[in-house]
Amino acid sequence: MTTLFISDLHLDPARPAITELFLDFLRTQVRGSDALYILGDLFEAWIGDDTPSTAADAVAVALHAVADAGVPVFFMAGNRDFLVGETYAQRAGFRILPDPTVIDLYGHTTLLMHGDLLCTDDTAYQAFRAQTRDPVFQAQFLAQPLAARVAFAQQARAASQARHAELKQGDQSNVETVTDVSPAEVEATFVRYGLDRLIHGHTHRPAIHTVQAGGNTCTRIVLGDWYEQGSVLRLDADGVSLEQFAL
């Protein structure tokens, strides 16, 4: 049996082909698995479970069908969809996990994260994250009319795009450093949890890394994004496989 991990699909009405690819993935590649873990940024944006979206409705139906077929589905919020709540979770048939989460995978204790907490060199983002993950902020935001939430999301996206454009105009190596994980934070995370395997997304740099932490040899598995292709990590008792598949 196999456990599947995906992240960073960034499903968006402007990119319907990726949504169709994901729905096909759920129909053809997930049934019979031990579990499906979605480690954040399933959606490009999420401003409340009450937001009308035919694409999100279709995804919920497809995910619930997977769960109904006996495959548990787990969701961990990313930096784009941290406002996904229990209302949508019930519609989609998945369980929301905190970030980080520790699970047992075929006898191997493993840490799961979205990955943005590891990007500590991006101090501006970490400050934004702390603000937007605050329960009081979220309650106040979700209490606003839909139009106000849409406007806020558009402003936040524009600010993010402007900041990334500004970074790209500078030293390219600095861009890579700021937008990738901090090696020191990765090492500290392994030591903090006393584990030797971590699976995360967020950076869109799929790879399997060997890390030395606390005198131990550890493995960091980075999931791929779904911008121009599909990407999945298949993990079983015998090993792991990072795979991509075309539109």
UniProtKB/Swiss-Prot annotation:
List of residues binding substrate: 79-80, 122, 160, 171, 174, 202
NCBIfam families per UniProt: lipid_A_lpxH, PRK05340.1
Cofactor stoichiometry and binding remark: Binds 2 Mn(2+) ions per subunit in a binuclear metal center.
Function per UniProt: Hydrolyzes the pyrophosphate bond of UDP-2,3-diacylglucosamine to yield 2,3-diacylglucosamine 1-phosphate (lipid X) and UMP by catalyzing the attack of water at the alpha-P atom. Involved in the biosynthesis of lipid A, a phosphorylated glycolipid that anchors the lipopolysaccharide to the outer membrane of the cell.
HAMAP family the record matches: LpxH (MF_00575)
The enzyme's E.C. designation: 3.6.1.54
Domain of life: Bacteria
Species of the source: Xanthomonas oryzae pv. oryzae (strain KACC10331 / KXO85)
SUPFAM superfamilies, per database record: Metallo-dependent phosphatases (SSF56300)
The name this protein goes by in its record: UDP-2,3-diacylglucosamine hydrolase
GO molecular function terms attached to this record: manganese ion binding; UDP-2,3-diacylglucosamine hydrolase activity
